[in-house]
Amino acid sequence: MNDFAKTIPYQKAGISPDGLNASIEPVVLNPSKEMALRKRPAVIVCAGGGYEFLSDRETQPVAMRFASNGINAFILRYSVRVKFPTALLELAAAVKYVRENAERFDIDPEKILVCGFSAGGHLSASLATLWNSSYLAQFLDNPE
């Protein structure tokens, strides 16, 4: 299990982490000297694939485009072929991970967004509507 996956509270949600392989890949360009004093926004990109597979052609080019425009990007490789709420929990944990590592990645922790395509878009929209729910808060130790 990778370091990011170790931060996901699967057991709190009654999910066995066995066989799950969520990971997060930073696509962060070194800031120019002019940008040294400015924290950057961040985006977490979620691929589509019908929750059956992850389409890399949808994530890498998009993350690179964000990064080339001064937005630190992260590619979330969420678990597929799993029951709800596994992928949602992984995305929520990814936002928490990026926020907790904001200093390390020169990120403004108040400017983190998510985007996705197809299933990844559904996942992003689900988080957008449930992010402050008691449902996710109980798993992520966040106050409502």
Language-model-derived ranges and their functions:
Residues 39-48:
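Short beta-strand element of the alpha/beta-hydrolase
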